[in-house]
Design a protein with these regions (language model features):
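Hydrophobic alpha-helical transmembrane segments
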Residues: 2-68, 76, 80, 95-127
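Basic, amphipathic juxtamembrane/active-site segments
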Residues: 74-90
Length: 127
């Protein structure tokens, strides 16, 4: 049981390191907060919450993995190497792909609600 709990401690330490050291991780957290606030305001459904939660976790997980790749590349070489650049670029690309997917999900869920708010000046739950 101790090693199981120790694993959680290590995981939280890793997340804390990413948040402290990576500006983009903090940007993702701000957007996650905005999505949660919008979800509460627009009263998204339970399935929509599940989709939003999965989407946010995918983006943040990609950021964590990108940080791990960058750390390992930096550890492996201190001079420029095109293979190191390719690894770092691929990690950044993975984050970009998940972030673009998250934007698409956000538009699908919040787009009609935001449009109704802009057009009518108010938002009412239409069900």
């Amino acid at each position: 049981m101790k090693s199981f709990l120790q694993g959680f401690l290590y995981a939280f330490q890793g997340i804390a390191h990413v948040v402290r050291s990576q500006r983009n991780a903090r940007v993702h957290l701000v957007f996650m907060g905005a999505v949660i606030a919008a979800g509460l305001y627009f009263r998204v459904t339970a399935p929509e919450w599940a989709i939003l939660a999965l989407t946010m976790s995918l983006v943040f997980s990609a950021e964590i993995l990108n940080t791990a790749v960058e750390s390992q590349v930096d550890l492996a070489t201190s001079t420029f190497d095109p293979r190191a650049k390719a690894a770092k670029d691929a990690g950044a690309g993975a984050v970009l792909v998940t972030a673009l997917g998250a934007i698409a999900v956000g538009l699908a869920i919040f787009g009609p609600r935001l449009w109704a708010l802009v057009v009518t000046g108010t938002y009412t739950l239409c069900k």
